[in-house]
Amino acid sequence: MHPRFQTAFAQLADNLQSALEPILADKYFPALLTGEQVSSLKSATGLDEDALAFALLPLAAACARTPLSNFNVGAIARGVSGTWYFGANMEFIGATMQQTVHAEQSAISHAWLSGEKALAAITVNYTPCGHCRQFMNELNSSLDLRIHLPGREAHALRDYLPDAFGPKDLEIKTLLMDEQDHGYALTGDALSQAAIAAANRSHMPYSKSPSGVALECKDGRIFSGSYAENAAFNPTLPPLQGALILLNLKGYDYPDIQRAVLAEKADAPLIQWDATSATLKALGCHSIDRVLLA
């Protein structure tokens, strides 16, 4: 079991501990539960889906990286496929506050980058901030997404974001988590190709500035993040954050990164290079390359 889970695991009910122990035994537990695993946990504990998600939140929050606030938030995004995806907030010392990742963004990106097609619900241990409510409104499930909070009845996003402004107001038809392929040819080595593939999945209807980041760890594992724009602009999630979300949730740490590649267009209206390289250097990665989409 990864050390970060030990304290939270010890506080779980005995029957949930017993059912989870073989799942968490792998140090690189992928921070997700398949539909089959969810069904097995429900049977072992007698909990329904909502109660089980609440019971698992401490494990999601244990994935938080909060050296600045020490305020750990956990989220579990429930995919329409039946898979549940953990998420947690992340802060980066030496970077800027704008680089921060919120738990809801983490869980949603985890699902999206794992190939999930849409979300049915998200469970969070604290009320989503306005930034996250706006981020969720970009999803293809948008205002119908169910939000579950401890001690409250579940409500749809539309109840938390009345009179919402979103992509439909800008006549955007393709939404976050819809399948997209921008068709750029995969060239270069495996890491460069992973970055280009991530850029091809970008959701960037506002700036038309595709980008993707791929991180290679010392053991050869590659984590890729795609750019995710938002109708309100500021809640946009950069591609580096997507890759760092996966790196963290899958049990790796920043010192494990040995090389990074950013893929973007040289003449794009928005450029990721400066922010990407500055944040990576703050995390200790100095081997950073850029490949140009053509």
Curated annotation (Swiss-Prot):
Enzyme Commission (EC) number: 3.5.4.5
Gene Ontology CC entries for this record: cytosol
Keyword Metal-binding: yes
Active site location: 104 (proton donor)
Residue numbers binding Zn(2+): 102, 129, 132
CDD domains listed in its UniProt record: cytidine_deaminase
Cofactor remark from the record: Binds 1 zinc ion.
Protein name stated in the entry: Cytidine deaminase
